[in-house]
Structure formats: C-alpha cells, structure tokens
UniProtKB/Swiss-Prot annotation:
A Pfam family matched in the record: SH
Top-level division of the source organism's lineage: Viruses
Gene field: SH
Residues in the Intravirion compartment per record: 30-57
Alphabetic keyword roster: Host cell membrane, Host membrane, Host-virus interaction, Inhibition of host NF-kappa-B by virus, Membrane, Transmembrane, Transmembrane helix, Virion
GO biological process: symbiont-mediated suppression of host NF-kappaB cascade
Localization per record: Virion membrane; Host cell membrane
Native species: Mumps virus (strain Kilham)
Subunit structure: Interacts with host TNFRSF1A, RIPK1 and IRAK1; these interactions interfere with host NF-kappa-B activation at the level of receptor complexes. Interacts with host protein UBQLN4.
Protein's job: Plays a role in the inhibition of the host NF-kappa-B pathway. This inhibition occurs at the receptor level, by preventing the signaling of TNFR1 as well as IL-1R and TLR3.
Stretches assigned to the Virion surface side: 1-8
Entry's Gene Ontology cellular component terms: host cell plasma membrane; membrane; virion membrane
Keyword hit for Membrane: yes
Family of this protein: Belongs to the rubulavirus small hydrophobic protein family.
Protein name: Small hydrophobic protein
Length: 57
C-alpha cells in the first residue's frame, strides 16, 4: 500500500489560504505604516511651516 497522500485540491486549498493570510497580513501592516507616516508627515509639515512663518516675521 502506497503512502497516503492528501488530495491535490486540498493542497491547493491550503496554499491559497496561506497566500490569502500572508497578503492580508502584509496589506494591514502597509496600511498602518502608511497612515502613521502620513499623520507624522502632516504634523511635521505643520510645525515646520509655522516655524518658517515665525522666522519670516
């Protein structure tokens, strides 16, 4: 009797599931990083423009 192998569709299903999990994980991290970066950039820009305005006066 040959070694029991899982059906091919099950393997593909597992791979697709793994791919989806990884994609979702990466997408979440990138979104959070992007939002944080944009927020900090806006804060820095605001403080920098205010500082520049104060210096010009």
């Amino acid at each position: 009797m040959p070694a029991i192998q899982p059906p091919l569709y099950l393997t593909f299903l597992l791979l697709i599931l793994l791919y989806l999990i990884i994609t979702l994980y990466v997408w979440t991290i990138l979104t959070i990083t992007y939002k944080t970066t944009v927020r900090y950039a806006a804060l820095y820009q605001r403080s920098f423009s205010r500082w520049g305005f104060d210096q010009s006066l």
